[in-house]
Amino acid sequence: ADGALTPVTFELIVLENYDLANRLLKFATELPRHASEANKRILLVNLAQSYKFMNKQEQCLSTLSKVDWSACSDDFDLCVTVLKDQFKKAATIMRNIGPSGLIKRHDYIDWPIFKEFRKTSEFETTYTEIFGVEPTELLTQDTTPVSERNE
């Protein structure tokens, strides 16, 4: 069940329907079993980001504190770091991920989790350094809906 909720709740966050996404994600994260540990963590990150975009930073941080993220891959580490507004650390993690990591160049532009990070000079400088193009160029070029991109 939690596997089916992941794309639905992500799309709700993209559409800025944070309240509904939040309710579904609370349900999904409280299920007794999950498809995988990675899927459970994706749901927790999405729940935390729904709280963040509802201006409930305390609940965002509380959600993130429910699991130990220290042994996670860089992609999870980046998401958690961005949700905590630790943008200098996030830029370092971006460099570690590089141009061919799990998070692709369009993901940095499209994923709602990076919304606040994209507004920083750390993001613009690091993105340009990694991908050789300014992120603003991508923002103006691609009009394909996020859910239809494969890159």
Annotated model-derived regions:
Residues 2-121, 129-151:
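Alpha-helical protein-protein interaction modules
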